[in-house]
Structure formats: structure tokens, C-alpha cells
């Protein structure tokens, strides 16, 4: 929450500046989506998201130098890192497809993370705190950063899948590209040019592009989540002598892994595309919310950052 001595705390100030940049970017992104997209507006939105990402980068580095450990030890740092991961993933996706739909779909997630961290958390969860002995390990950077980046990629991919559900409402969706390609199975058109037959590639539909980008982003997130779970098991065995203890966070991380494994299975083995796998990905949004925020706020288990049931 805001404090009178805000200017004396650069970490909180940088977080609020990132919030301001995202708050400006969001209405511009929706406005650019509502009418004919303007390249100048798209550029401003992108610059604001870049500014937010750089501000979050500076914030996390400042907290790292100030605390002496990787800035992921409490819910405030975790939320800011997740917002950084979401903005980074968003910018990476926009490089593949500079569409106004991408910032309109994904900017709200980063904004919610920074807003919750800046305005909803008590001071005790915003201030830096020393690490408990079990967390003083080189595995901290490896495990937690990979898990958080997997959440960011899965969230962005799932939001793009949610956008698929709102394209071509009430119409059958014809997707011509494969799940493992990028238009290699598109139907081509034949035209004649002075008696010569010309093979012309069919244009890629909006829903098709969204479907393909969400699939690729979720695939990256799933691989990162797999690496994160494995590294967490190795770390747990070193710290507590047990590979898996069915801690609430571990259980929900496994559920999250199974949901997105089902998403990939339906695409690769069943050939699902469009709205059906999109619904599976959207259900993953709920699972990640419970895994990340829900379990944390209950204050139960080894992975919690919460305060509701803390003594």
C-alpha cells in the first residue's frame, strides 16, 4: 500500500511508475482495437509496455542489490516478477505478430499484478526480508525464476486463446494451418495471369493467427513448467530429503501441468484447433490463479507468501 515516505523507497516508486505506464497503455490498446488500427497508436502502446518492462527490470535489480538475494522472496516481489515476465512475453509475441489484439488481450494481466502488489498488499509483504535458511540455495534462482516465467508464458498464451473465443462469434471457425506448423497446410488459390497459372497463398485469418500464437506460447510455458517442477523436486530432496511432499503448491502445480498437457495432447494427438483447445487453455487460467495466488494467500505450506492465516 502507499506510504508517506514513498520517495524514499525506489522499489515501490518504480513499481508505481510501471503501473502508470501500463494504466496508460491499456485504454489505448482497447481504443486501437475498437476501430481501424493506427500504427502510431500501436507504437505508443508498445513503447509504454517497453517502459513498464524496463521499470520493472530496474525495480527488481534494485531490490536484488538492496536485499542481497534474488527478488522473489515475498508476494510483492513475486507479483512484480510475474508482471515483468508477462510484459516480456507480450513484447516477444508482438515481434512475431504486431497486432493490436496482443496488447489488448495481455496487458490487463500485467496491470492487475502490479496493481495488486502496489495497492493491496500490507507493508510487511512489500518490504524486503531475509531469506529463511532453506531458501539460501543456488536453486532459488533456477527453480523460482523458471516457474514464474512458465506462469507468464502460460497466462499470455491462455489469454490469446481466450481471444480466439471472441473472434468470428456465431460462425464456424475454419483453421487451415496445422498445430505443429505455421500455415504449411493452408489452402492455396489458383489465378491466371495472361494464360499462366499462378499459385497464390491464402491469407491467414485472424483466428488462425491467434490460435497458432497461443499454441506456441503455451508450448514454451509448458516446457518451462516441466523444468521448474523437476528442479523444484531436486531442490526439495536436497533441502528436506523428499522429492515430493504433496504440499498445496506442489499439488496445484501438478494439476496445472496436467491441464496444459491435456491441451497439447488434444492438439497434437486429436488434431483439435480453434475453440475446443481454447476452452482447455482458458480453464488453465483458473488453475494458475489457484496455484499462484490462492495457495499463497491461504498461508499454508512451504510455498506460501500469504497472511490470511498467519499468526
Swiss-Prot record:
It is found in: Cellular thylakoid membrane. It is a multi-pass membrane protein. The chain crosses the membrane at residues 11-31, 44-64, 68-88, 101-121, 146-166, 217-237, 251-268, 280-300. One of its GO terms (cellular component) is plasma membrane-derived thylakoid membrane. Keywords: Cytochrome c-type biogenesis, Membrane, Thylakoid, Transmembrane, Transmembrane helix. It holds the Pfam family Cytochrom_C_asm. It comes from the Bacteria. One of its GO terms (biological process) is cytochrome complex assembly. GO terms for molecular function: heme binding; heme transmembrane transporter activity. InterPro entries: Cyt_c_assembly, Cyt_c_biogenesis_CcmC, Cyt_c_biogenesis_CcsA, Cyt_c_biogenesis_CcsA/CcmC. NCBIfam families: cytochr_II_ccsB. Belongs to the CcmF/CycK/Ccl1/NrfE/CcsA family. Required during biogenesis of c-type cytochromes (cytochrome c6 and cytochrome f) at the step of heme attachment. May interact with ccs1. PANTHER family: CYTOCHROME B_B6 PROTEIN-RELATED, HEME EXPORTER PROTEIN C. This is Cytochrome c biogenesis protein CcsA. It comes from Synechococcus sp. (strain RCC307).
Amino acid at each position: 500500500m502507499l506510504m508517506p515516505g514513498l520517495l524514499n523507497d525506489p522499489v515501490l516508486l518504480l513499481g508505481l511508475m510501471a503501473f502508470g505506464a501500463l494504466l496508460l497503455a491499456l485504454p489505448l490498446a482497447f481504443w486501437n482495437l475498437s476501430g481501424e488500427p493506427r500504427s502510431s497508436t500501436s507504437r505508443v502502446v508498445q513503447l509504454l509496455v517497453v517502459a513498464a518492462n524496463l521499470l520493472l527490470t530496474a525495480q527488481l535489480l534494485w531490490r536484488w542489490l538492496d536485499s542481497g538475494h534474488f527478488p522473489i522472496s515475498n508476494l510483492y516481489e513475486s507479483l512484480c516478477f510475474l508482471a515483468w515476465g508477462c510484459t516480456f512475453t507480450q513484447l516477444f509475441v508482438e515481434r512475431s505478430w504486431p497486432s493490436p489484439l496482443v496488447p489488448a488481450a495481455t496487458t490487463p494481466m500485467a496491470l492487475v499484478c502490479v496493481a495488486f502488489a502496489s495497492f493491496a498488499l500490507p507493508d510487511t509483504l512489500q518490504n524486503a526480508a531475509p531469506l529463511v535458511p532453506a531458501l539460501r540455495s543456488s536453486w532459488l534462482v533456477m527453480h523460482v525464476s523458471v516457474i514464474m516465467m512458465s506462469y507468464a508464458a502460460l497466462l499470455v498464451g491462455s489469454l490469446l486463446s481466450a481471444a480466439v473465443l471472441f473472434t468470428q462469434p456465431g460462425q464456424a471457425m475454419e483453421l487451415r494451418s496445422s498445430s505443429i506448423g505455421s500455415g504449411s497446410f493452408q489452402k492455396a488459390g489458383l489465378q491466371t495471369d495472361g494464360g499462366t497459372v499462378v499459385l497464390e497463398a491464402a491469407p491467414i485469418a485472424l483466428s488462425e493467427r491467434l490460435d497458432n500464437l497461443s499454441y506456441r506460447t503455451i508450448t514454451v510455458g509448458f516446457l518451462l513448467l516441466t523444468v521448474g517442477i523437476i528442479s523444484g523436486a531436486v531442490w526439495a530432496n536436497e533441502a528436506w530429503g523428499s522429492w515430493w511432499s504433496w504440499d498445496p503448491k506442489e499439488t496445484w502445480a501438478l494439476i496445472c501441468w496436467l491441464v496444459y498437457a491435456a491441451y497439447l495432447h488434444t492438439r497434437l494427438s486429436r488434431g483439435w484447433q480453434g475453440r475446443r483447445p481454447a476452452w482447455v487453455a482458458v480453464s488453465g487460467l483458473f488453475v494458475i490463479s489457484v496455484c499462484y495466488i490462492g495457495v499463497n494467500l491461504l498461508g499454508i505450506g512451504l510455498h506460501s507468501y500469504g497472511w490470511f492465516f498467519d499468526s
